[in-house]
Design a protein with these regions (language model features):
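Extracytoplasmic
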Residues: 32-254
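Short acidic, Pro/Gly- and aromatic-enriched capping/linker segments at domain boundaries
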Residues: 6-20
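Extracellular/periplasmic catalytic domains that process cell-envelope and extracellular macromolecules
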Residues: 20-21, 216
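Short, small-residue-biased leader/transition segments that mark boundaries at the very start
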Residues: 1-5
Length: 254
């Protein structure tokens, strides 16, 4: 094997090549083919609900029995996915009911919109609700990111009942969230994710979380979000609604 790795290329095995198969010709090689790994960051869109566990849970009927994964319906649907392994949560006391089947919002709710709603424009036709209370938190793993610098943009969903967050009234600071990557305090930033919305109109909106953040290693990363808006303990309409996060590469000229 040592000689093969030193050669750094795979060779055809003559006796095992040109073998007729049903859908083509088989050729045997004597080593692994090398894997190519980009060193240049690429655009990544991270859908917070795009997990196999969520799909299996919803389609298995463990949530709202009328809900189908990534599917628009005549009515809105919400399933409780708080216990799934893709979400690590620390829920605190909340002024908002956590009974998502009776007008409240689960600690982590998987939501699909109704036909005709602006939320049908969500990535993959779904989004998540967070009802974790003041200083409650959630940790998730990102998709693989190539080492490099990125601008990070959060796509949020907004309803008119959240106007007090948009206007930063009734004790709200705009839906402020504290973001941290990989437990590194140097990456921590607090952003009022609804304060930049200019009109009280149901829809999807972008909020810049980082103008620039650098990841030194290629791989997945842990992202923690802490609810830093005290209105979570005082307003029964408080919740956070998220669609996806975009990692936009920053390519610097050499």
């Amino acid at each position: 094997l040592g000689d093969v790795y030193k050669r750094q290329k795979a060779m055809f095995v003559e006796d095992g090549s040109d073998v007729q198969a049903k859908n083509g010709i088989l050729h045997e090689i004597d080593s692994w083919l090398p894997l190519w790994e980009s060193e240049i960051p690429v655009l990544v869109e991270w859908d917070f609900a795009d997990y196999e566990e969520v799909a299996a849970w919803v389609n298995g009927g463990y949530g709202d029995p009328d809900q189908k994964y990534q599917t628009v319906d005549e009515g809105e649907h919400q399933s409780d996915v708080s216990s799934l392994a893709c979400y690590t949560i620390d829920a605190k006391s909340s002024a908002t009911s956590t009974d998502g089947s009776n007008g409240g919002y689960y600690p982590v709710g998987y939501a699909t919109p109704k036909t005709g709603s602006a939320w049908t424009n969500c990535k993959n036709k779904d989004h998540i609700y967070l009802n974790l209370g003041y200083n409650g938190s959630i940790i998730m793993k990102t998709p693989i990111l190539i080492a490099g610098k990125y601008k990070v943009i959060l796509k949020v969903t907004y309803a008119t009942s959240m106007n007090f967050m948009r206007t930063m009234t009734s004790g709200s600071n705009g839906g402020k969230i504290r973001f941290t990557f990989d437990g590194d305090s140097e990456t921590t930033t607090e952003i009022p994710i609804y304060a930049s919305i200019t009109a009280n109109t149901l829809g999807l909106y972008d909020t810049v979380i980082y103008d620039e953040i650098e990841f030194s290693k290629t791989g997945t990363h842990s992202m923690k979000m802490v609810i830093a808006d005290p209105a979570a303990t005082s307003n029964s309409k408080f919740r956070i609604q998220l669609d996806y996060m975009t990692f936009e590469p920053i390519i610097e000229d050499e």
